[in-house]
Amino acid sequence: MKTLAVVSALLSLAAGLAIPEDATPLEIISSRPLTIEERSSCPKGGDLPKGALQPTLMVPISKNLPDVAFGPTWNPIVTPNDFCTIFNLVIPSSGFNKTCTLEFLFPSHGQTFSPYIYNGAGHFTFTGYAFFSGATPETTYNNQPPPGPSPPSPPAVLAPGNAYVINAGPCFIPEGEASMEVSGALCSPDTDLVYLQTENMGCPIGFYVVISDPEE
């Protein structure tokens, strides 16, 4: 109960201001149901293939506290029209001429031991930033990375018990580059979401990138 009270106090910082005008709704390419039985069958890493990439840095920002740097976290937080979390991912050189698939894995409480809070209608937006840019521990709402491509789509719902493909396409890493940093901010107009990003507590939860050969 004490933990819940602390998180509830954090969520109470949301004051109902509008989300950024350049925020783009999440593009859900496909989804698949996760069943209760999957937790017992999920090895370490769950259903993620070998080599799946997880965020290298996650930084919350707040529209109501636009100059406050909250620093790195493994517990992303999203609140209605206030807190967003920026996710950095680094694409290695092995992604050259490959397909990158951005997934959001969202198991139910019965499928993961990772604690999370989810409350609301489940609408989220994802604002992309320019390639080779991303958040730093000092990033705030007022000094976000420069804008970049975002997956255009109608409003989408993320709900527990599902695994979502947010976007899939060329990795775009130039030939000869050792790596390329990509990033984006997850926000919501109507939903509280706080979770522990992990792939080691039953089924994995959070954002991941899977690199694969392009389909012919």
Briefly describe each language-model feature range.
Residues L57-G110:
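A short beta-strand-loop element at or near the start of a globular domain
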Residues M1-P33:
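Fungal secretory targeting signals
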Residues P20-V59:
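Juxtadomain low-complexity/linker regions and immediately adjacent membrane-anchoring helices
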Residues S183-E216:
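Proprotein-processing/basic-patch segments
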Residues Q111-S179:
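Beta-strand-rich interaction/scaffold domains
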